[in-house]
């Protein structure tokens, strides 16, 4: 059956079938190949796209702006909206839906992007919330397919760190849909929500995926195709969380030793970025000096190794986001 996503919002991978996700990945591969051949499309010619940002961004903003422009769209970047302050989310959605053909939202609450989608009348795309990050997962899966050279259904992906964060959940949703073996690796006190685990395990019955949690590094990483991590305190979280968080998560830091424990010399290291892997950022250096803690979630050696595909992931944000826009709002 042909896949048609015209007019659909992209809020979470939970809303999409494996066939629909496969379609978006195939379209991403195609658009990337055309871009490299110097062929740009015009699927969004004459269309207007607005980007709503509550949280700062490098990759998400650049990916949406470049992707939209390369397909012919006009883009508005909006950071000073009155949404939720002097104007309700519903009213803002209705106004923007009259002027724009697609709306991207990057912010805090998942309920905000859902409310926008409910009332806008045009596709709404989730650029990140505290609960989910679906565009990142498409980029991750595209990157895995390019480097692992086997189907996603044969991939074992281990997310190590705070397994309650949006990246852990987003990867879990994608893995469940695509029949992958996903392990959330971290301390018991930072275990994923039990209801979400059960929900994903239900999805897995249909796709053959395996979704599990482990606090044992040696067992969890054995045979892994991918080791994935994220910073230990997310955007918007209080800095005071660091001392206890670092104490809990240091055993789950991605090190050369952890990579070796996979028993797979080709294990990929992945990270959604930004990353604390050295002291070359003001924030990381300042916090390490003030707190007297090593807050880096990955060793610099691993981050810069041949196994690291983090910058391929970053590039692939653009190709996959372009695919989402073309598929849902294109001509």
Swiss-Prot record:
Residues binding carbamoyl phosphate: 57-60, 82, 106, 133-136, 272-273, 317
Enzyme Commission number(s): 2.1.3.3
Pathway named in the protein's UniProt entry: Amino-acid degradation; L-arginine degradation via ADI pathway; carbamoyl phosphate from L-arginine: step 2/2
Primary location recorded for the protein, binned into one broad class: cytoplasm
A molecular function (GO) term: amino acid binding
Cell location: Cytoplasm
Gene3D superfamilies on file: Aspartate/ornithine carbamoyltransferase
Keyword annotations of the record: Arginine metabolism, Cytoplasm, Transferase
Keyword Cytoplasm: yes
Chemical reaction(s) catalysed: carbamoyl phosphate + L-ornithine = L-citrulline + phosphate + H(+)
GO-annotated biological processes: arginine biosynthetic process via ornithine; arginine catabolic process to ornithine; citrulline biosynthetic process
GO cellular component: cytoplasm
Chain residues that bind L-ornithine: 166, 230, 234-235
InterPro entries reported for this sequence: Asp/Orn_carbamoyltranf_P-bd, Asp/Orn_carbamoylTrfase, Asp/Orn_carbamoylTrfase_sf, Asp_carbamoyltransf_Asp/Orn-bd, Orn/put_carbamltrans, OTCase_ArgI
Signal peptide interval: none
Record family assignment: Belongs to the aspartate/ornithine carbamoyltransferase superfamily. OTCase family.
Function: Reversibly catalyzes the transfer of the carbamoyl group from carbamoyl phosphate (CP) to the N(epsilon) atom of ornithine (ORN) to produce L-citrulline.
Designated name of the protein: Ornithine carbamoyltransferase, catabolic
Organism (species): Clostridium perfringens (strain 13 / Type A)
């Amino acid at each position: 059956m042909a896949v048609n996503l015209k007019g659909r919002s992209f809020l979470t991978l939970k809303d999409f079938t494996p066939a629909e996700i496969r379609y978006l990945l195939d379209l991403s591969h195609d658009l990337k190949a055309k871009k490299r051949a110097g062929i740009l499309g015009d699927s969004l010619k004459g269309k207007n796209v607005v980007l709503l940002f509550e949280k700062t961004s490098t990759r998400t903003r650049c990916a949406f702006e470049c992707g939209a422009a390369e397909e012919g769209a006009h883009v508005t970047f909006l950071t000073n909206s009155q949404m939720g302050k002097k104007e309700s989310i519903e009213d803002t959605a209705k106004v923007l839906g009259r002027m724009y053909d697609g709306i991207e939202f990057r912010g805090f609450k998942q309920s905000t992007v859902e409310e926008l989608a409910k009332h806008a009348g045009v596709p709404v795309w989730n650029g990140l919330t505290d609960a989910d990050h679906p565009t990142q997962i498409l980029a991750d899966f595209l990157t895995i397919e390019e480097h692992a050279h086997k189907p996603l259904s044969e991939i074992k992906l281990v997310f190590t760190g705070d397994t309650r964060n949006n990246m852990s959940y987003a990867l879990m949703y994608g893995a469940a849909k695509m029949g992958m073996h996903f392990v959330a690796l971290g301390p018991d006190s930072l275990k994923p929500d039990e209801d979400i685990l059960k929900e994903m395990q239900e999805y897995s019955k249909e796709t053959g995926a395996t979704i599990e949690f482990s606090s044992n590094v040696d067992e969890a990483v054995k045979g892994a195709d991918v080791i994935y991590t994220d910073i230990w305190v997310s955007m918007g979280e209080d800095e005071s969380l660091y001392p206890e968080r670092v104490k809990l998560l240091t055993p789950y830091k991605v090190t050369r030793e952890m990579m070796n424990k996979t028993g797979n010399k080709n294990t990929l290291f992945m990270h959604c970025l930004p990353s604390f892997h050295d002291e070359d950022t003001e924030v990381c250096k300042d916090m390490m000096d003030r707190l007297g803690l090593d807050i880096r979630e990955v060793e610099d050696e691993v981050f810069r190794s041949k196994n690291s595909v983090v910058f391929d992931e970053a590039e692939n944000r653009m190709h996959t986001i372009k695919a989402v826009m073309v598929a849902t709002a294109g001509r």
